[in-house]
Structure formats: structure tokens, C-alpha cells
Amino acid sequence: MCAQQGVSLYRRYLNAGIMEEGLVSPRTQGVPQGSPLSPLLSNVMLTELDWEIESRGLSHVRYADDCNIYVKSEKAAQRVLNSITQYVEGELKLRVNRDKSGTFRPKDSTFLGYTFSKADSKRIVVAEKSMKRLWTKLHKMFNSARGTSLKKTIERLTPVLRGWRNYYRLDTRKQFWNEMDERIRHHLRELIWIAWKRPKTRAQNLIKLGLDLETAWKSSVNGRGAWWNSGQAHMNLTIKNARFARLGLYSLRFMAIC
């Protein structure tokens, strides 16, 4: 696509109407939030900002209108923030959102779901907010999976886990991904324990899966909750990791980029 075709496509998109209750009304200003045109227009408008930052010898990263600039001290950060704000508003005639702008230590900032490790400032890792969003989604999936077959539950988990892992592939902490895998399997074992319902059924299934008679019965009537039991030896020894792997559970530790 040549430049003229690109400009023509942008203009057609900007002039497109807005669908409201089945009717198209004209758009007088702005771009639909979340549309693919937003980051493209941001790049058109902010390429000069990239050049300005690079001409000052500063390290930076930008996605659409979200930009981080890295300097060596808090004093330098404040100076750069002020001068870049003046440049954007004075030269580019754009407004800087001061509520979202500021100076931060790298380990306290988040960019596109990543942050810097507190233990190793040169390593980028998954941000805490990103983790919380994922587990909120997974908890809803696990709660709605009660009464559903294990295979079906794993099939529903797979695209979520694969997509999340591929996006956060720059986080290379082996222990972190191992712990994530373990926690997911813990939830799946909990679903199995809940599905067995009665102590007698639990004991019978544990025995079928290789646990000795005495341990199986003691485990089935211990009076503890499903989450506690699903993390104990009687479940880890009988519901092995290999079983989940055979059913197609996606491993965050041993990722395959798709």
C-alpha cells in the first residue's frame, strides 16, 4: 500500500458513521475507542516525538500514545518530563494527560502489562496487575466448571493460557511459570475432589488410583475443605501431572509459541 492509499483509507475510516440502535449517524469528531485506527494515527502524530527523544540521546519505548522514557536519576526524570510536555503541547499541539503522567522508579511502573523485577532491575517481568486480572478470569472459569468434565474444562483453559503465555514470553523466570502451572493443577484437583462429593466415593476413587486402603479412607474423612485436600499427597500421588498433560493441559513452563 502506497502512502496515498493509506491516507485515503484513514480518511474513509474517519468519515465513517456511528452505528447507534441500528441507525447510522455521522461522526463529527474523534476516533472510536479501541479501533485499529487509533494506534496508527498515534504513530503518525507521534513519530516526531520519537525523533525528538532520540535526538536527546534518551532511551525510550512507545506504544501508540503510551510512552516511557528512562533516565538515571529522579531529578533528570522531572526535568525530562517538563521539557517533553512542553514539546508535545507547544510543538505538536497535543494535550498531555497530567493525571497519567509522572516520574517513577522502573520497578514501580507498568508498561503494556510488564514491569521491572525488584530483584533484578534489568529483567522485565509480568506486572502484578496483569497477574490479578488473569487470576480473576481463571477463578471465574474454575467456579463455572463445577459439574463439567475435566477434559472440557481444560479445553476452555487452553486458549486463555496459551494467549497469555505468548504475550508474556519476555518474562523468563522458570520458577514463576512453574508455580503458575502448579497453582492451575491445584485448582483442577480441587474440581475433581468436589466432583467426588461423598467420602465413600472419594475413598473408592483414591483406592482405584493406587492409594492404599487405610490412607484412602483417612484422607476421605479428614473433614478438611476441598482446596486443602487438593493440595495434599493423597491427591498429588493419585491425580498425576501426566494425566492433565494427556488431556491437553497447556503448560506455561514449557510454552510453545503459536
Segment roles from a protein language model:
Residues N15, Y87, E91-R156, V160-R162:
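A conserved non-catalytic segment of reverse transcriptases
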Residues S101-S109, R156-V160, W177-R185, K200-L209:
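A glycine-rich phosphate-binding loop feature that marks nucleotide/adenosyl-phosphate handling sites
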Residues M1-D108:
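Conserved polymerase palm-domain catalytic core
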Residues H187, W196-C258:
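Extended C-terminal regions of large enzymes
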Residues P26-V31, K122-R123, H139-T153, W164-F176, ...:
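Short, solvent-exposed helix-loop connector elements
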Residues Q4-R11, P39, N43, S109, ...:
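Non-catalytic, well-ordered alpha-helical scaffold segments
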